[in-house]
């Protein structure tokens, strides 16, 4: 039986407060899950909603990762900040990938480091 997970990928080049960081990760988790298939979403929930938070150096790395995930057919969500507090409006902060089968997500994220 396959395991399911979700990955949230953050940008190292953005220096966000802990609170802003947490909110952006939460936005990505919810938004990406809304794009998952009903079956994958149910299996993920049944398995405890496993989430992993990873990092990439730059915005370009985030865009490249989104494209890799798209080619694998994975649900994704790029999060843009409203710009009301710490960073300019429209700044892309994080990428949510999944939930989906762990082995599919690992094909895209296996070389990334944990936050």
Curated annotation (Swiss-Prot):
Domain of life where this protein originates: Archaea
Molecular function via GO: peptidyl-tRNA hydrolase activity
Species, as recorded: Methanosarcina barkeri (strain Fusaro / DSM 804)
Compartments in which it is found: Cytoplasm
Entries under SUPFAM superfamilies matching the protein: Peptidyl-tRNA hydrolase II (SSF102462)
Record's catalysed reaction(s): an N-acyl-L-alpha-aminoacyl-tRNA + H2O = an N-acyl-L-amino acid + a tRNA + H(+)
UniProt EC number: 3.1.1.29
Uppermost EC category: hydrolase
Protein name stated in the entry: Peptidyl-tRNA hydrolase
Cysteine disulfide partners in this protein: none
One BP annotation, GO: translation
GO cellular component: cytosol
Gene: pth
PANTHER family listed in its UniProt record: PEPTIDYL-TRNA HYDROLASE 2, PEPTIDYL-TRNA HYDROLASE 2, MITOCHONDRIAL
Function: The natural substrate for this enzyme may be peptidyl-tRNAs which drop off the ribosome during protein synthesis.
Annotated InterPro entries: Pep_tRNA_hydro_II_dom_sf (IPR023476), Pept_tRNA_hydro_arch (IPR034759), PTH2 (IPR002833)
Gene3D superfamilies the record matches: Bit1 (3.40.1490.10)
Keyword tags: Cytoplasm, Hydrolase
Family classification: Belongs to the PTH2 family.
Chief localization: cytoplasm
């Amino acid at each position: 039986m396959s395991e399911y997970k979700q990955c949230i990928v953050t940008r190292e080049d953005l220096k966000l407060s802990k609170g802003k960081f947490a909110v952006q990760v939460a936005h990505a988790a919810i938004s990406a899950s809304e794009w998952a298939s009903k079956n994958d979403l149910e299996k993920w929930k049944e398995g405890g909603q496993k989430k992993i938070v990873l990092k990439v150096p730059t915005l370009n790395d985030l865009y490249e990762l989104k494209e890799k995930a798209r080619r694998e057919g994975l649900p994704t969500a790029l999060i843009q900040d409203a710009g009301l507090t710490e960073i300019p409006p429209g700044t892309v902060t994080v990428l949510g990938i999944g939930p989906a089968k762990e082995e599919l997500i690992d094909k895209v994220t296996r070389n990334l480091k944990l936050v």
